[in-house]
Curated annotation (Swiss-Prot):
EC annotation from Swiss-Prot or TrEMBL: 6.1.1.9
GO terms for MF: aminoacyl-tRNA deacylase activity; ATP binding; valine-tRNA ligase activity
Task of the protein: Catalyzes the attachment of valine to tRNA(Val). As ValRS can inadvertently accommodate and process structurally similar amino acids such as threonine, to avoid such errors, it has a 'posttransfer' editing activity that hydrolyzes mischarged Thr-tRNA(Val) in a tRNA-dependent manner.
Lineage: Bacteria, Pseudomonadati, Spirochaetota, Spirochaetia, Spirochaetales
Organism name: Borreliella burgdorferi (strain ATCC 35210 / DSM 4680 / CIP 102532 / B31) (Borrelia burgdorferi)
Cellular compartment(s): Cytoplasm
Superkingdom: Bacteria
Full protein name: Valine--tRNA ligase
Short sequence motif named 'HIGH' region, residue ranges: 45-55
InterPro entries, per database record: aa-tRNA-synth_I_CS (IPR001412), aa-tRNA-synth_Ia (IPR002300), Anticodon_Ia_Val (IPR033705), M/V/L/I-tRNA-synth_anticd-bd (IPR013155), Rossmann-like_a/b/a_fold (IPR014729), tRNA-bd_arm (IPR010978), tRNAsynth_Ia_anticodon-bd (IPR009080), Val-tRNA_synth_C_sf (IPR037118)
Cystine crosslinks: none
Coiled coil: 803-837
Gene: valS
One cellular component (GO) term of this entry: cytosol
């Protein structure tokens, strides 16, 4: 058999071509002829986003699982799409307008929406093509966008259903204003950062000579004060309760009230109450029925409710100006440095302003109760299990969800108001088109819905709901969700709530939370720190398979992933190993006949058994989302068993003069190569598909082949154990040569002394050619005189090697004594830790286990070095 020769491993030369081949041959489409179903939806990336390492990790782990399920003959659907990302996309568009000297105010609403759609169309290809570079095998024909017509239909239906159930309402509440976008954001979209601020001690005068001193971090909000609150038990202020004070720099008077919320020990013990701009003050105002004064515009500027000289200023600029005037006019008693936690919008980075506004909300508790029960009943599982606590915490402490956003980009709220009567109608279309509303005029609510309001419907809206068509029936509920920990509440919990409310089922059974990416210093990777790694740089340098295998191999369930760019060399070396080993086999096909009737010897049976074990290990690992274990199984099989042992041993028969023996050897190598490519394919699909295409039939695609199954007929436990014994001997001689710095190429005499009950003596003698190939010996002796040889004990036999003439005995003894002392000291240190009850009780479980392994390792090394020393002294 002859095939096209592989050149050097150059992923740039074939990865794009392979991906196109998969698309052309509909590899990623589900197969409805298969009985068992596997479906999964991908977290939709922002349509204007670019690929980062978090995306890469998430999509790689999804794709590895999807490819495995597809090859295991599941009817597999992986649904992908992009998110319209309201605030983020509109911000990108407004930055674009600024560059060309325009603003959003230059457009009518519909014109603006159309312009943003054009931007979306230009950007969508960027993130999608980048995800394709990873080898993502999602169904391209079913790609969705959260503003697609059917998804809009689903959003409107959900809004209406919740409204008529009394679970959506409109009310005036304190919300979180992002001044950058002019929109409100939810509590969960806020990141708190410690900032260096000031604590201002301000005088609120009762009359010309007496005043009450108030401590505040935000003097600019005093124009929204409607009371001063003190603790009822604070003796200092009891006589002032009920009296009026004047807000500094104004003539406005407000009352002193008593409320137990006030902490007498903080500041001066007197609290300015600003209900429209502080959540705690808002609650105080409700208890005391006092007014609320909003001093901000929607873009975070001071409004007409403040003195004229401050109107139009940002809060920060106003604070500086007010501080100066307070000082000049004698209202400022003191200013102290003060560290404080300040909320920032996680999307825009802007400081959040508490803001009194009329908004739309979802009552969440009735939905959350059902979602909690789903976890308790076992309908939903998290991997790792620890993330169940995060899920439970959010749902147990849930607040109503503010779903309205002051944007033009997104799902328009399906609510209309009668221009003349303010009557409210919930409808997809203009109610004036209805005959019963003839002559009435309506305007639609100007706000759009929070981006997450469409995202929480993703598992079923992307499958056609509210239409219950073939896709919905076949693939809902989905099997698995793979996502990041930081959107457990934003997305995961909300999807569970929506799924239960609108379909009566959880939208997925398993939730796998990916590791948190950190740099080598343990810092979380983030754009602000600039410590991220661009996955496209890694792909350009090493290829997609290198990125994929490294991320999968290092993804230990429940542990953070500390990584830098150099780590991807690991995946590159493995992909290169696969390529070069395959190249060796394919080169040896030349002028040889491939046999179908394979005769397996004991070494073949050892490898078949190892393959069986690997298949079981991979299956068990994927069942529990242990990617690193699955990766390790295939890595160990291919690199160690297949390459380091089987291929090397096969070279004996490949070099045999008998052509029939050569043909049998290459036929078995090709058989095992195909099995190897199959088990490796989900992890490194590009290089395995490329290699397979070099010897398979033209129309045969590796990705559509069945993943090998455990085969009891290929489980040869006795042959497996026998070869393990032979390996022990070979490894012992190799190790001995290495530890005494004897080059592997140097031939030495070796000897074996078998125990009386050792039953594999004949096997050893029959396989001398393998031993010769693997350790390069001069002569091998059995049960003879071992004087002058260095010995190593093994189970069932003793191993001896003649190294006396190749080493300096005195120097080696000195070296070994130093090594022995080093490992004894290390073992003492580990022993002390393991004897310390505090360490055992308080240290993380993985650290304790690591120390136990060290103790075993050091003890073994001490024993081995001691034996070397004793043997050397007797030479």
């Amino acid at each position: 058999m002859n095939c096209r020769p592989l050149e050097k491993y150059d992923p740039k030369a074939f990865e794009d071509e392979i991906y196109t081949k998969w698309l052309k041959n509909n590899v990623f489409l589900p197969d409805n002829s298969l009985f068992e179903k596997f479906s999964m939806v991908a977290p939709p990336p922002n349509v204007t986003g670019v690929l980062h390492m978090g995306h890469a990790l998430n999509f790689v782990l999804q794709d590895v699982l999807v490819r495995y399920k597809r090859m295991k003959r599941h009817n597999t659907l992986w649904l992908f799409g992009t998110d319209h990302a309201g605030i983020a996309t509109q911000a990108v568009f407004e930055r674009h307008l600024k560059k060309i000297g325009k603003s959003k105010d230059d457009f009518e609403r519909e014109e603006l929406v159309q312009e943003i759609f054009k931007l979306k169309d230009r950007h969508r290809g960027i993130i999608v093509n980048q995800i394709n570079k990873l080898g993502a095998s999602y169904d391209h024909s079913r790609e969705r966008f959260t503003l697609d017509e059917n998804l809009c239909k689903a959003v409107n239906k959900v809004f209406k259903d919740l409204y008529f159930k009394g679970l959506i309402y409109r009310g005036e509440y304190l919300v979180n204003l992002d001044p950058g976008s002019g929109s409100v954001v939810s509590d969960e979209e806020i990141e708190y950062k410690e900032v260096d601020g000031k604590l201002y001690f301000v005088k609120y005068f009762i009359d010309n000579s007496s005043f009450i001193e108030v401590a505040t971090t935000r003097p600019e909000t005093m124009f929204g004060d409607t009371a001063i609150a003190v603790n009822p038990n604070d003796e200092r202020y009891k006589s002032l309760v009920g009296k009026e004070v004047t807000i500094p720099l104004t003539t406005k008077k407000i009352k002193v009230i008593a409320d137990f919320y006030v902490d007498s020990a903080f500041g001066t013990g007197a609290l300015k109450v600003t209900p429209a701009h502080d959540p705690n003050d808002f609650e105080i105002s409700k208890r005391h029925n006092i007014s609320k004064v909003n001093i901000l515009t929607q873009d975070g500027k001071l409004n007409k409710n403040v003195p004229l000289q401050y109107q139009g200023l940002s809060a920060k600029d106003a604070r500086f100006k007010i501080e100066t005037e307070l000082m000049e006019k004698g209202f400022l008693q003191d200013v102290k440095k003060h560290k404080q936690q300040v909320g920032h919008c996680y999307r825009s980075g802007e400081v959040i302003e508490p803001y009194l506004s009329t908004q739309w909300f979802v009552r969440m508790k009735p939905l959350a109760d059902k979602a909690l029960k789903a976890l308790e009943n076992g309908e939903l599982k998290f991997y790792p299990k620890k993330w169940e606590n995060t899920y439970k915490y959010w749902l147990s402490n849930i607040r109503d969800w503010c779903i309205s956003r002051q944007l033009v980009w997104g799902h328009r709220i399906p609510v209309w108001y009668n221009v003349d009567t303010s009557e409210l109608i919930v409808s997809d279309t203009d109610p004036s088109l209805d005959e019963k509303n003839m002559g009435k005029r309506f305007v639609q609510d100007p706000d759009v819905l929070d981006t997450w309001f469409s995202s929480w419907l993703w598992p079923f809206s992307s499958l056609g709901w509210p239409n219950v068509d073939v896709d919905f029936k076949n693939y809902y509920p989905t099997n698995t969700l793979i996502t990041a920990y930081d959107i457990i509440f934003f997305w995961v919990a909300r999807m569970v709530m929506a799924g239960l409310e609108f379909t009566g089922q959880v939208p997925f059974k398993d939730v796998y939370i990916t590791p948190l990416l950190r740099d080598k210093q343990g810092k979380k990777m983030s754009k602000s720190l600039g410590n991220g790694i661009d996955p496209l740089d890694i792909i350009n340098e090493y290829g997609s398979d290198s990125l994929r295998f490294t991320l999968s191999f290092l993804s230990v369930q429940g542990q953070d992933l500390n990584i830098d760019a150099k780590d991807f060399m690991f995946g590159a070396k493995f992909a290169n190993k696969v390529f070069n080993a395959s190249k060796f086999i394919l080169l040896n096909l030349k002028n040889r006949k491939i046999l179908n009737d394979l005769k397996f010897n004991d070494i073949d049976k050892w490898l078949l058994t190892s393959l069986n074990s690997t298949i079981l290990g991979v299956e068990s690992s994927f069942a529990n989302y242990k990617y690193n274990e699955a990766s390790k199984f295939v890595y160990e099989f291919f690199w160690n068993d297949f390459c380091d042992w089987y291929i090397e041993i096969s070279k004996i028969d490949l070099n045999n003069e008998n052509v029939d023996i050569q043909n049998m050897a290459i036929s078995k190598l090709l058989f095992f190569l195909k099995k190897s490519l199959l088990i490796l394919h989900p992890f490194i699909p590009f290089v395995t598909e490329k290699i397979y295409s070099e010897f398979a039939e033209k129309e045969d695609i590796l990705a559509l082949n069945e993943y090998p199954n455990f085969d009891i007929a290929n489980n040869f436990q006795e042959e497996f154990e026998i070869f393990k014994v032979l390996k022990t001997f070979i490894i012992a001689i190799r190790t001995l040569k290495s530890e005494f710095n004897i080059p592997a190429s140097v031939e030495i005499d070796v000897a074996l002394k078998f125990d009386a009950d050792f039953k594999y003596e004949a096997y050893f003698k029959a396989n001398e050619s393998i031993v010769k190939r693997m350790i390069n010996f001069k002569n091998i002796f059995y049960n003879e005189n071992y004087d002058g040889m260095l010995g190593v004990a093994a189970v069932g036999f003793e191993i001896y090697a003649d190294v006396k003439s190749l080493i300096d005995k005195t120097k080696e003894l000195i070296r070994l004594e130093k090594q022995l002392e080093k490992y004894k000291m290390l073992n003492i240190s580990v022993s002390k830790k393991l004897e310390n009850e505090n360490f055992l009780m308080n240290a993380p479980k993985e650290i304790v286990e690591s120390e136990k392994l060290k103790f075993v390792e050091f003890s073994s090394l001490i024993n081995k070095i001691n034996n070397y020393i004793i043997n050397l002294k007797n030479l």
